[in-house]
Amino acid sequence: MVSQSLSYIRIGCTSNAELKALKPALKELRKCMPDIYPMLFLRDYSRLKTMFESGHIDIMLVTKDMIENTDCTFKPIKNMKSYALISDDYNKTTEDNKDLHSMSAISFDDLKGHCLLLLNQRLIPFTQGNLLQEKLVLHSQDNYHFICENSQTSELLAQCGYGIAILPEFCIDSPLDNCRILPITDQREIQYGIAYNKTRSTKDTKKICNILISNLKPQ
């Protein structure tokens, strides 16, 4: 029988990798607050932010950049970077003939001449002055790139050798078969965490956020 006191918490995120990362946190939430039922929303950032600001979701998994200038509380979980995904079958070298598969990190100089698989910016918005975004814009002026509408498409095309995918850590469905994941050197770390609305939050909202923060396991 369903409890008459059942209530809901609406949680939004932008990638399948984040949904997987929520698994241990939601298990703990069910143990600690069994009358709270999570409703999960997977949307692109633009729609997610609109839902958040209009009160249609209670909690978002976000980077701090994503919720800049909004009336919310941000609780950090970890600092994250973006990565280059390179298939084991991708046999091109850098312009100076370095083997991409022998590298432990990669720079935009190394990426010259390569097709990049990029996410639509509405999925991973950047603030003005973001070094990685500036490098991506410069790269696209002289090199071919392909815009993907979700992270799964980007990962798939990278695994099939169509190019090198550039993805933020929270979008990578790790581990990936036959694919190397290399940190990009030309960037700054971004703060990733949980946001909730200051004015609409309750004691339950804050307690749920603490449970999520303590148990969320990003890839």
Tell where the protein language model's regions lie, with residue ranges:
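Flexible hinge/capping segments at coil-to-helix
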Residues: 3, 73-116, 206
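Ligand-binding cleft/hinge of the Venus flytrap
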Residues: 25-33, 56, 126-142
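A late-sequence structural motif
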Residues: 21, 180-219
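Short beta-strand-to-loop elements that line the ligand-binding cleft
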Residues: 37-44, 140-150
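N-terminal winged-helix
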Residues: 2-50, 201, 205-206
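Beta-alpha-beta core module
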Residues: 69-76, 80, 152-199
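Beta->alpha turn/N-cap motifs
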Residues: 44-45, 61-66, 87-88, 150, ...
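Secondary-structure junction motif
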Residues: 104-108, 112-139
